[in-house]
């Protein structure tokens, strides 16, 4: 779902989390940074939604927190890099069958993405947190034209598209053109990052050659 402004998106994110949380369905909220995770934590605190924040500031319990993300009433806000390699069990890490059955009836784990990230691979990893190994689950991404990725690439074009489609304030839209534009933006970032890594490796090779010459002359 894409909105015009960050504020409109934030209202939609918190509303969705509130609605899902009332049912008891577990929720895992993905953000792009520590600042963003704390931003959404503040919004949920104002709504009285109990939750945990998992980021680099409290990573000691990372594996335990992520492993229990599938428990009833669980709401966890995390950054995109947290909990890699940790399986999320519906009903919690103890895998009690009755608890798992309850969570399945509620719809499994609900993954909420608060923006599209710079890498399609990371986006897919976030989506893949729900519906693992045949379990039921759902994922939804909330975007705005003021997101970092959108501001850097393609927001003017998308703004024009949204205007032509008659999008009103507070309304959201999904459209194949928007999806393609986002994927192109991510490809540009991935290509840029790849070029940077190649340059760094090239400089490393030069430095290593210089070190060898210095050692040989000693």
Mark where each language-model region is.
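Conserved nucleotide-binding/hydrolysis micro-motifs of P-loop NTPases
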Residues: 1, 34-37, 58-60, 81-85, ...
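Conserved interdomain hinge at the start of the Helicase C-terminal
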Residues: 2-28
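Structured core elements
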Residues: 2-3, 28-31, 36-39, 52-55, ...
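Conserved motor-coupling elements within RecA-like helicase/translocase cores
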Residues: 17-24, 34-108
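Short, well-ordered alpha-helical packing segments
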Residues: 14-21, 38-45, 51, 63-70, ...
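C-terminal helicase module of SF1/SF2 nucleic-acid helicases/translocases
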Residues: 101-218
């Amino acid at each position: 779902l894409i909105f015009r402004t960050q504020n409109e998106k934030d209202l939609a994110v918190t509303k969705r989390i509130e609605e899902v949380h009332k049912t008891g369905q577990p929720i895992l909220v993905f953000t792009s940074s520590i600042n963003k995770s704390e931003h959404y934590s503040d919004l949920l605190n104002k709504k009285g939604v109990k939750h945990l924040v998992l980021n680099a500031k409290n990573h000691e319990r990372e594996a335990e927190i992520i492993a229990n993300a599938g428990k009833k009433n669980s709401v966890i806000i995390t950054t995109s890099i947290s909990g890699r390699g940790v399986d999320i069990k519906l009903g919690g890490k103890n895998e009690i069958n009755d608890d798992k059955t309850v969570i399945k009836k509620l719809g499994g784990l609900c993954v909420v993405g608060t923006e599209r990230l710079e890498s399609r691979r990371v986006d897919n990893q976030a989506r893949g947190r729900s519906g693992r190994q045949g379990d039921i689950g759902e994922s939804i991404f909330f975007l705005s034209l003021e997101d970092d990725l959108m501001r850097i690439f393609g927001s003017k074009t998308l703004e024009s598209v949204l205007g032509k489609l008659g999008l009103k304030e507070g309304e959201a839209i999904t459209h194949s053109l928007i999806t393609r534009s986002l994927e192109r933006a991510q490809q540009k970032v991935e290509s840029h990052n790849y070029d940077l890594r190649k340059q760094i490796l090239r400089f490393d090779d030069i430095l290593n050659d210089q070190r060898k010459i210095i050692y040989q002359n000693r």
